[in-house]
């Protein structure tokens, strides 16, 4: 019998596979399908994770950039105190302006921004109150609630540091004496104040603002790897203070 005849006979054979061969084929197919499904699930999980991180980073940095830009635009003139007495750990109230002029004397281009963290809604809102008159350094603005309000951040929470939650806004003023050369403390002359500027006079000493919050993606999931912690510090100064024995400095100097 030739080889061709043998092959034709095998092809015409209706006995099929044996039970053992069939079981081996089924098990092999299941293993291949399970491996493919595992790769698909892992790929989808990683894609969703990267998307969430991207969303959280983009939305968080957009909000942070806006706040920092407004703080950096707050020194209208030398020795001006932009942080207002209504500021708290969850609300930053400051006067700023945008102009081509080196110093802004009239209230024409000035505005008051009220940046508020709403813990229940998880949002950061920025209400802009336009100037209604006044002259430097006393400006008049619209009443709160009458300005333009914009949601600049969603799915925002307080940053956790161990068991503690950091305030959204922290306020700094110049220490009276700089740290000595052999000190183990930070060399900066700016020290965090333990009280918010509840009085008008206290607001005039605030020379730096710390901003910290955690941004989650649109899904609202705050699991590890999906949310992003953002933390920065903005100084209200034109230059660094001199290292004199007693530091006598303030905001926008």
PLM regions: where:
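Aliphatic-rich helix starts adjacent to a transmembrane/signal segment
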Residues: 2-76, 245-253
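Short linear sequence signals and composition-biased patches located at protein termini or domain-edge surfaces
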Residues: 2-5, 55, 159-253
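A broad, structure-centric signal for solvent-exposed, well-ordered loop/edge residues
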Residues: 8, 63, 78, 101, ...
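Homeobox/homeodomain signature
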Residues: 29-31, 40-46, 54, 61, ...
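Short, glycine/small-hydrophobic-rich surface segments
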Residues: 48-49, 71-98
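Generic detection of short hydrophobic beta-strand segments and adjacent strand-loop junctions
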Residues: 64, 115, 150-152, 228-236
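Short, ordered beta-strand-loop transition motifs
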Residues: 83-89, 118-121, 200-205
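Type IV pilin-like appendage domain
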Residues: 89-188
């Amino acid at each position: 019998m030739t080889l061709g005849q043998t092959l034709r006979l095998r092809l015409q054979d209706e006995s099929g596979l044996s039970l053992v061969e069939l079981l081996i084929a089924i098990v092999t197919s299941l293993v291949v399908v399970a491996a493919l499904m595992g790769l698909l699930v892992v790929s989808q999980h990683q894609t969703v994770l990267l998307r969430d991180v991207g969303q959280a980073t983009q939305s968080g940095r957009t909000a942070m950039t806006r706040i920092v830009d407004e703080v950096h635009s707050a020194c209208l003139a030398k020795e001006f105190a932009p942080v207002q007495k209504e500021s708290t750990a969850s609300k930053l109230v400051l006067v700023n302006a945008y102009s081509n002029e080196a110093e802004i004397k009239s209230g024409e281009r000035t505005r008051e921004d009220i940046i508020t963290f709403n813990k229940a809604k998880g949002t950061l809102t920025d209400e802009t109150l336009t100037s209604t008159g006044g002259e430097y350094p006393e400006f008049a603005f619209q009443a709160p609630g009458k300005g333009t309000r914009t949601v600049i951040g969603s799915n925002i929470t307080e940053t956790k540091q161990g068991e503690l939650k950091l305030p959204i806004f922290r306020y700094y003023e110049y220490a009276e004496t700089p740290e000595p050369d052999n000190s183990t403390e930070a060399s900066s002359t700016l020290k965090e104040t333990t009280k918010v500027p509840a009085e008008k006079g206290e607001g005039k000493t605030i020379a730096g603002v710390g901003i910290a919050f955690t941004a989650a993606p649109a899904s609202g999931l705050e699991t590890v790897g999906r949310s992003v912690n953002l933390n920065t510090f903005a100084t209200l100064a034109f230059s660094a203070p001199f290292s004199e024995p007693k530091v006598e400095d303030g905001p926008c100097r």
